[in-house]
Structure formats: C-alpha cells, structure tokens
C-alpha cells in the first residue's frame, strides 16, 4: 500500500462510527485463533492517531511480524474493514438483500442444488417485484432461465 493508500486506510478508520468500529472488532475477532489479532492492534493504534504517521506505527510495532510485509498487512486490514461494513449493512437495504439472494442462488446452482436455487430465486423475484427493483429482477430472470436451460439439458 502506498503512502497515499495508507492515508485511505486512516481515512476509512476515522470515518467509522462507534458501532461500526465495534462491529469490525467483533467481525475480526471471529477469524482469530489463539492470541490477539495483529489487525485489531493496528486498527486500534491507527484509530488513536490524530494524523497518519507511519513512522510512529513502525516504532510502536518494532520487531513484530506485523511489520514484515506491512503494505500487505495494511491492504488486508483495509479489505477486512470493507468486508465487515458489507456484513454490517447487508440487511439495511433491499438491494443488498436481493444481491445476497442472487449470490446464494448462484452458489446453490453451482453445487447442483437446483430446487433450492429455484426457491431462493422465486423469493427474490417476489421481493424485487414488490419493491419495484426491475434491473435486479432482470438478473433474477436470467438466473431462472439458466435453471430452465439446465433442466432441459439434464432431462435428456
């Protein structure tokens, strides 16, 4: 992560609300085995800064594995924060719920669970119609068509 990108990480952390920060910490701690997560320590340290100063980070985490590939660590922290925000806001918008349903349907289709896929798509279709989300409805119809084509080819 370049210095400019480092400021993006700092800006992202500073933009988080108190509840978003708490959610990130809970989200991140689920993926930790054993001792404290280095990402959380870095997150907390950056959060306490008034301005981004990478030299202070290097001094604070001196001789710790966290700094071995620091640009990768910062990039992963940035991406983990975005993933946690995605999970945090997943149920807050109808569009997010519909895209989640489409994603689940795609997974079920790829696993060969066609009846379950069809059920998820039917539910998403009702929700999209009810909320007048016609662009997403077209994607749902596309996946339903894929199901019908698959059923046609597997019947022979």
Question: What residue spans do the PLM features occupy?
Answer:
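Extended alpha-helical scaffold regions
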Residues: 1-156
């Amino acid at each position: 992560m370049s210095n400019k990108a480092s400021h993006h990480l700092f800006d992202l952390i500073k933009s988080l609300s108190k509840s978003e920060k708490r959610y990130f910490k809970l989200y991140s701690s689920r993926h930790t085995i054993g001792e404290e997560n280095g990402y959380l320590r870095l997150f907390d340290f950056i959060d306490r800064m008034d301005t981004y100063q990478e030299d202070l980070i290097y001094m604070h985490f001196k001789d710790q594995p966290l700094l071995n590939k620091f640009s990768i660590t910062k990039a992963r922290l940035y991406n983990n924060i975005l993933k946690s925000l995605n999970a945090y806001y997943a149920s807050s918008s109808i569009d997010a719920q519909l895209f989640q349903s489409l994603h689940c349907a795609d997974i079920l289709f790829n696993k060969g669970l066609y009846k379950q896929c069809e059920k998820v798509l039917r539910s998403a279709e009702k929700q999209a119609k009810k909320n007048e989300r016609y662009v997403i409805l077209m994607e749902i119809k596309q996946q339903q068509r894929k199901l019908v084509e698959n059923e046609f080819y597997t019947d022979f």
